[in-house]
Amino acid sequence: MSTGAFYISSLLEKMTSSDKDFSPKSLGGSRVLDPLPWLQILAAITDWISGDRTQDLALPRFMATSDLMSELQKDSIQLDEDSERKVVRTLLRLLEDRSGEVQNLAVKCLGPLVGKVKEYQVENIVDTLCANMRSDKEQLRDIAGIGLKTVLSELPPAATGSGLAISVCRKITGQLTSAIAQQEDVAVQLEALDILSDMLSRLGAPLGTFHASLLHCLLPQLSSPRLAVRKRTVVALGHLAAACSTDLFVELADHLVDRLPGPRAPASPAAIRTLIQCLGSVGRQAGHRLGAHLDRLMPLVEEFCNLDDDELRESCLQAFEAFLRKCPKEMDPHVPNVTSLCLQYMKHDPNYNHDSDEEEQMETEDSEFSEQESEDEYSDDDDMSWKVRRAAAKCMAALISSRPDLLPDFHCTLAPALIRCFKEREENVKADIFGAYIMLLRHTRPPKGWLEAVEEPTQTGRNLNMLRAQVPLVMKALQRQLKDRNVRTRQGCFNLFTELAGVLPGCLAEHMTVLVSGIVFSLADYSSSSTIRMDALAFLQGLLGTEPAEAFHPHLPTLLPPVMACVADPFYKVAAEALLVLQELVRTLWPLDRPRLLDPEPYVGEMSTATLARLRATDLDQEVKERAISCVGHLVGHLGDRLGDDLEPTLLLLLDRLRNEITRLPAVKALTLVAVSPLRLDLQPILAEALPILASFLRKNQRALRLATLAALDALAQSQGLGLPPPAVRSVLAELPALVSENDMHVAQLAVDFLTTVTQTQPASLVEVSGPVLEELLQLLHSPLLPAGVLAATEGFLQALVGTRPPCVEYSELISLLTAPVYNQVGDGGPGLHKQVFHSLARCVAALSAACPQEAAGTASRLVCDARSPHSSTGVKVLAFLSLAEVGQVAGPGPQRELKTVLLEALGSPSEDVRAAAAYALGRVGAGNLPDFLPFLLAQIEAQPRRQYLLLHALREALGAAQPDNLKPYVEDVWALLFQRCESPEEGTRCVVAECIGKLVFVNPPFLLPRFRKQLAAGQPYTRSTVITAVKFLISDQPHSIDPLLKSFIAEFMESLQDPDLNVRRATLTFFNSAVHNKPSLVRDLLDDILPLLYQETKIRRDLIREVEMGPFKHTVDDGLDVRKAAFECMYSLLESCLGQLDICEFLNHVEDGLKDHYDIRMLTFIMLARLAALCPAPVLQRVDRLIEPLRATCTAKVKAGSVKQELEKQDELKRSAMRAVAALMTNPEVRKSPSVADFSTQIRSNPELATLFESIQKDTASGPSMDSMELS
């Protein structure tokens, strides 16, 4: 026998020992006991000494059971079959032990034991517990109930693939049903109902075979004379409703509705309350299934809400809340009545005279059903009106969150009522009233900058203006409450004001006196917990960020002392929050980009003393250390010129923190703040020591430290310049070549920026490192992934190298280094390097030419020669043309005369890369000399139709690079030429023409944009689609002066969605998608008219499907596929930027259609469905049974025999995308209760291929960011 088995055996022997009087032998030798057994032993010793030995001590069994509990909780324990049987038998016997302590320990052992024994032993445990529940002994029944709950809670969930939980639950369901049905013993009924509720909440769907019997067993219990039974039955029915079949749900709903009497019919108040409470429970657990029954339910519930019964009113309002949250679409006709009832009962307080100043303290307990509530909860002496008011407030919050489209009405009706109710005397109710108003604020928050939203004549702007009018009323209502003795009230005020300031920045400035008074009151409140001080500090910090600095100036003498006291607070969280506030105060009141309007002299000493005291302390929490360092950085950076003799000690303290490994990162950031300060402080006392320390940080693996260090070094180099000690600078420069690498582009960019600054301030220091740095930099330029920021930094560095006097590196040497990899290429197998590398090298050549204009003409001439030489390789020609595109504009007219001929010849090159580079150069060079080049370019487009595509590309570049004023003389000629080519049969040509038209419109938008009307009305189909495509190129993601004019024409352009031509409709959808994605404000107000047309384009049109014969095979072609795909892409973009304007139920109808469409569209809709599951869980839940079927069909689809590899890969990707949507749906616990989802989940677990795929997707979701967005424009 192993040591573990022997130990278990010895424990079992002790657990079965008979009771004895206490003796030293019962201690089990000299083993060390846990604290709990020692307490038992101490009590036993006391009784024994006193002579009372009749008590059942049972110490050996108790201690052995405790030891067994410890063993079972170890992962390493393994029981053989014999040990399993003995342990189970012994523990079940101990459940009947005379000692209550032994019983309690034994039942606790059952939890960990479940995972250590075989299934049949678990079933044995469950059988015994069920039998004990029917025992005549009350204590045994209680312990059996606890045991069953313990076992059920420890069973592995069905989602893990284990069938144990399901088999155990099926085994006991029948016994629970019979226990509930028998009326003799209420205690057994209650215990069985509790266990059944727990089972249904965890494993409702897998118990489908029992649902009918459970329903028929539970429904009669709604009429039980015992309140506790009725309440537990209501909870169980709620869980059952979420998991049962549609037929059973309809039966349950019909039962509840049919038994609701008419409001004037005689009925038991208790029976009505129970039925309404059951409706509320079903609404909370399965409200998405109640939508079809609401038209019958709501009139009855509304009538009952008017009866003189506060408990019934509360239940009705709770039911309304559930209905609003779970089926908002179906509640639409009932919203006015619900709103009226909420307004009526939110002020329902018949037992209180509001004119009195005396506030009554009342018990505030949760009214939600739970098994702990007792039958006498609703005593005649209880004032239930506060629960009615709280239910009304919660219902109002649900109303606001479920119907954001009614915000204007809510601001007129709900907002004033909520503000009046801020004086509510009951704290729980007041918290929910605050919550409802905060919900209104959050939905009023505009989706973009608030200032633009206020000025915009849309509904959002009107909502914000209505909110602004409410601010004085809110302030008046909350003025006294900011100093309320109740902490929770003040916290609610701070939360509400924080949200208000975030929605409407600046609106609290004129009320600052009241707010500061309230903040100071809470900061000085040491009688309550520190939480209120932290809340007050957090509110103050937010206020400093949203309100103008001038509003704080008069209040600083009042505000600063309590903040300083909090900085010195012994509790680290308060101190950390106070330091953050102090930092914000400094940054807001004495900004560096504006003149000082407030003299800092009276305050700077106090702030410096308090902060440095925190910084010098050595026993601080890490968060306080970091905040103190940051605060010192802001203090020195903003007010260093007023610190006087304290400046140098403060800098030395920062230097000391720079040496400490724990504080070095915040110290580096603080040093950066000091260095970038326009105060130009003298940092000489620390520079010689700080630079080598910073240099050492560049070798660390901590990326954040390297980035912060490079930023600090660049700031120091810019601010101190020649003041930096050259030896220290060289020590830093020695670390830089290793950082100029494509391994981390951001680090490389900062390193090059620092090199540029050093080159400009201390060029002599670069002598030793310029070679290695240039070598790494040139290697970096060969990366095809080079970001624009790194390229711009490289250009600046190269310009700095040739800009010093004398230059650090000669111009010719740098040009040679840049072009050598291309010029030295052996053979002519094509360009060689990646296309993007040529553009990067060309940009650098142009940057050098711009820095040395005297060299530009010579460089351009050499490039022209290289471009026209028959001996030049393709790579050399491409680089020459791309360089000429950049250099030609600054090279002067000399080389340009010869350049025309060279570029035109190159358009006929056999190399596509050379032709594209020549076209690009022709346009860019022409932009610098429009009078000479543009007429020539237009003439060539007319004369050379075979080169038209390349010449149009050149025209596009010229229009994009030239100044608008310089283009005005040529507008009419270019316009005419472009519209002559709108009917080109080549789609690529039409697309380039559209882009040219878009760029041309920017020259004179008010004159040219209205011309589109004529073209759309009279043009041919190709012309109309080209015009609409051109509109797409007028939309950018940045604000532009054309936006207001464009917005006035959008409605007319969108009428093209009704164009009979497919290409025009597709172009219109593409343009609409670009607008929604980049500038949704252009189309938001038109969605009511656009969406029906958009949805129409998602339908499959049979008249557009045709068969094409390809040899012996027939191939189906769907001409409408591209239009449908464009429509679904628009729908996805609308989810991201216009969610509030969508009717999600209607939206889901078309998503549902897309789930059965073509491969490309299904891929789109799977992504949309995953997004909707996160954004709009309630509507998705309502139709999950319909959504899951196409997903199941996709996941279980079989590939046809003989399919090619491409088909197999497409099917695998489709299956993976569908499974991602399934995984996203299943993140909602309520979705998992759906019978159809539970059935599919079982199917996934039983199929090894699907199970593996599902597990891999879940791991991917857990380890990486989800696909929250998709670029479609």
From Swiss-Prot:
Probable assembly factor of SCF (SKP1-CUL1-F-box protein) E3 ubiquitin ligase complexes that promotes the exchange of the substrate-recognition F-box subunit in SCF complexes, thereby playing a key role in the cellular repertoire of SCF complexes. Detected in heart and skeletal muscle. InterPro entries: ARM-like (IPR011989), ARM-type_fold (IPR016024), CAND1/CAND2 (IPR039852), HEAT (IPR000357), TATA-bd_TIP120 (IPR013932). HEAT repeats lie at residues 2-36, 37-74, 82-119, 121-157, 167-205, 209-246, 248-284, 292-329, 364-405, 409-446, 469-506, 554-591, 602-641, 685-722, 727-764, 768-807, 809-850, 894-931, 933-968, 970-1003, 1004-1040, 1044-1081, 1085-1121, 1142-1178, 1194-1231, 1241-1273. This is Cullin-associated NEDD8-dissociated protein 2. GO terms for cellular component: cytosol; nucleus. Ubiquitinated and targeted for proteasomal degradation. It holds the Pfam family HEAT. Belongs to the CAND family. Residues 352-383 are annotated as: Disordered.
